[in-house]
Amino acid sequence: MFKTRFISGAVLTLLTIGILYLGGYVTGVAVMLLSLGGVFELMRVYKQEKSAMAVLAYLMTIAYYCFLFFHLEKYLLPLMILYVLLVLAVYVITYPKYTDKDAMVAILAFFYVSLLLSFLYQVRILKYGGALVVMVYICSCINDTFAYCVGVKFGKHKMSPKLSPKKSVEGLLGG
């Protein structure tokens, strides 16, 4: 198990480094595909991955990245407002097929996954964006390592036993 995790982690790390090194549209398309995968996974958690709400979230993700690629940033806010209104319209028109929970999941899927992941691309295209992205990655790795080491060595108080049984308050503070 460890060997498989190590090899897949090494391959993904090398792939990530290559994509970030190339920058531009390569990074943008990779992040867009990652966003679509994340939206799919979130929608699947709620058993909606093939619903009309999911299709709206997928299309919004693609449209959002296209707006970024073609430097149409001034239209992003109207696009996002239109998306929320469209999701709510589908909810109202198709009720009770789709519930308020379904509509909120579709809205969350775009904003929590696609919008937040897009900042990886947006930072990367800045003048020193490559260095900034690498710095964020390094800081995250250091934080995770310290949290793990402090938690293993000093962890006595469980943070959330049902959700994540091995995490401790000490590990949280160590990271």
Regions found by a protein language model. Give the residues of each.
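Membrane-embedded alpha-helical bundles of polytopic integral membrane proteins
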Residues: 2-162, 166-168, 172-175
